Swiss-Prot record:
<keyword id="KW-0472">Membrane</keyword>
<dbReference type="InterPro" id="IPR009760">
    <property type="entry name" value="DUF1328"/>
</dbReference>
<keyword id="KW-1003">Cell membrane</keyword>
<dbReference type="Pfam" id="PF07043">
    <property type="entry name" value="DUF1328"/>
</dbReference>
<feature type="transmembrane region" description="Helical">
    <location>
        <begin position="30"/>
        <end position="48"/>
    </location>
</feature>
<protein>
    <recommendedName>
        <fullName>UPF0391 membrane protein YtjA</fullName>
    </recommendedName>
</protein>
<dbReference type="GO" id="GO:0005886">
    <property type="term" value="C:plasma membrane"/>
</dbReference>
<keyword id="KW-0812">Transmembrane</keyword>
<keyword id="KW-1133">Transmembrane helix</keyword>
<comment type="similarity">
    <text>Belongs to the UPF0391 family.</text>
</comment>
<feature type="transmembrane region" description="Helical">
    <location>
        <begin position="4"/>
        <end position="24"/>
    </location>
</feature>
């Protein structure tokens, strides 16, 4: 998940440097969503792993 977030961030930065506002905004939005989903999944796996049988 974090890999995809970093990829979208790099795409957004390159697009912003080249002046493509729409593409940069879309890639940045996708990067934010992927990052948040990754954080949520990490926290869920962290707490689910602490339970003892």
């Amino acid at each position: 998940m974090f890999r995809w977030g970093i990829i979208f961030l790099v795409i957004a930065l390159i697009a912003a440097a080249l002046g493509f506002g729409g593409l940069a905004g879309t890639a940045a939005g996708a990067a934010k969503i992927v990052f948040v989903v990754g954080i949520v999944l990490f926290l869920v796996s962290l707490f689910m792993g602490r339970k003892r049988p």
